[in-house]
Amino acid sequence: MPYFGWFIVLGISLGIVIWQISVWLGETKDKMEKYQTALAYALSRNKPLLIAGGPYGNQRIRHLLKMPAHGNGDVCLDIDRNAIDGHPNAIIASVTHIPFPDKTFGAVFASHLLEHLPTTTEAKQALDELNRTAEAIFIVSPSWQSISGWLHPDHHLWVWQDGKTTHFKQRGKSSIKKKKEYTVNHD
């Protein structure tokens, strides 16, 4: 019986690891599906695809292993040069001030980007910019079930999409409090 406690701890730990792997696999599947949908949408409009949030992020290991988190698109925008290093059409700019004319892009794919903005106000400003420059927006962000999403110190918002509605929730605010503040409809 002295090892029973250790078996319980091991079982719980293994359960958490399996759960987080399944969450990660779900996020990866969602990201790849949305990227492919964004690419197909841009092609159907005969316009370029904008990637907001570089495929390499701020992880140098992705460059070394040549493992981008997603495709490059036609134009890639990020505030961090490392995230877009090597892209032939890389633009260093903020998602809240995109330096392109209205509806330049058929679609924009924003991956693991908006949750880094400090407030819902800035996230709405970014969403307005994305809507201004592209005909369709495809957003990917960490799942609420992702432990790393909760622990990441630079994640200030929860972001999710339901069809053509994008939701923002400032971390630390009650879900009862002004739900309207967190919801933005877009076409």
Model regions and ranges:
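Class I SAM-dependent methyltransferase Rossmann-like catalytic core
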Residues: 2-44
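Compositionally biased, low-structure terminal segments
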Residues: 5-8, 106, 169
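Alpha-helical membrane-targeting segments
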Residues: 25, 29, 68, 147-152
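A broadly tuned "polar low-complexity/structure-edge" signature
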Residues: 31-41, 54, 60-67, 140, ...
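Generic structural motif recognizing short loop/turn segments at the entrances and edges of beta-strands
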Residues: 35-39, 45-49, 73, 87-88, ...
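Metal-centered catalytic cores of metalloenzymes
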Residues: 45-59, 176-187
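Conserved SAM-binding loop
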Residues: 47-146
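S-adenosyl-L-methionine-dependent methyltransferase catalytic module, highlighting the catalytic core
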Residues: 120-187
